[in-house]
Regions:
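Substrate-binding surface in catalytic domains of secreted glycosidases
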Residues: 43-52, 119-237
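A general structural motif
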Residues: 6, 29-31, 66-68, 110, ...
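Hydrophobic faces of well-ordered beta-strands that scaffold small-molecule active sites
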Residues: 9-13, 32-36, 69-73, 113-115, ...
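Structural recognition of alpha->loop->beta junctions
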Residues: 27-35, 88-117, 166-189
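A generic secondary-structure signal
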Residues: 59-60, 99-106, 139, 209-214
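Short acidic/His/Gly/Ser-rich catalytic and metal-binding motifs that mark active-site loops
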Residues: 77-82, 113, 190-192
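Glycan-recognition patch characteristic of GH18 chitinases/ENGases
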Residues: 1-104
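Intrinsically disordered, low-complexity coil segments
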Residues: 65-66, 90-91, 105-110, 140-146
Length: 237
């Protein structure tokens, strides 16, 4: 019996503050997988280093060898970047794939790649979007079959069931192109939305029920809401 089945924990280094480093120091023994938020991608497909410096993470990488350390590549929710990569505009996707290989070569100790591409388009683009993730997955596995690939996915309660316009994402189609998937089920309302509940129970249950029906449940990390917003009618939170 696998006593850890269903009890894995994934976190990311998005915050980059003192509290984050304290948590890594004190609680790293409880973490299974970490996305290193140290890479961003441009609309040209170029990947550049930004965010938490890899050099600042080496102490924790060496201290906790049981953790899968993944290089996270993000587009910061820029639709123009997502679209250029998806459509291979001026060879953007081709360059992106070669850049993924480059950063794995630069940091050979990494356990794999974490893809955080957000703010895609509607359902009419789901085939092309899935093809992009297929190409990323095949690129990672062609480089080294042992490298792990995690993908970050928006909260969905059905096909075409995004509250944030992310209907390009079809869980069942993407299941084959990841080793794990982090479902962002922690933000029905967020800093860029209208005021509302962060993650109402009905929405969370809808995501969990749908995701476990169409994806391999053993692959999934489900995001847990542990925050709130100070909504203000005269300013952003």
């Amino acid at each position: 019996m696998d006593t850890l089945k269903g009890k894995q924990i994934m976190v990311c280094t998005f915050m980059g503050n003192a509290r984050m480093y304290e948590a890594l120091r004190d609680y790293g023994d409880r973490i299974s997988q970490i996305g290193l938020f140290s890479f961003k991608v441009r609309a040209t497909g170029e990947i550049y280093e930004s965010g938490v410096a890899i050099s600042d993470m080496l102490t924790y990488i060496n201290r906790w060898p049981h953790i899968k350390w993944l290089l996270t590549v993000a587009n910061d929710g820029a639709n123009s970047i997502f679209r250029a990569l998806r459509d291979n505009t001026d060879g953007a996707q081709d360059r992106f794939l070669s850049e993924i290989v480059r950063i794995m070569e630069k940091y050979p100790w990494c356990d794999g790649i974490d893809i955080d591409l957000e703010r895609g388009d509607g359902y009419s683009t789901h085939t092309e979007s899935t093809a992009m993730f297929c190409n990323i997955y095949n690129t990672v596995k062609a480089y080294d079959p042992a490298k792990h690939m995690n993908i970050c996915l928006p909260g969905m309660t059905s096909v075409n069931g995004s509250v944030g316009g992310e209907n390009w994402c079809v869980y069942g189609d993407l299941d084959a192109y990841c080793d794990t998937a982090s479902i962002m089920s922690y933000g029905m309302a967020w800093a860029g939305s209208a005021p509302g509940p962060v993650s109402p129970r009905s929405w969370l249950e809808g995501i969990y029920d749908y995701a476990t029906k169409v994806m391999n449940p053993d692959k999934m990390f489900l995001g847990m809401p542990a925050h709130g917003w100070n909504w203000q009618i005269y300013d952003t939170p």
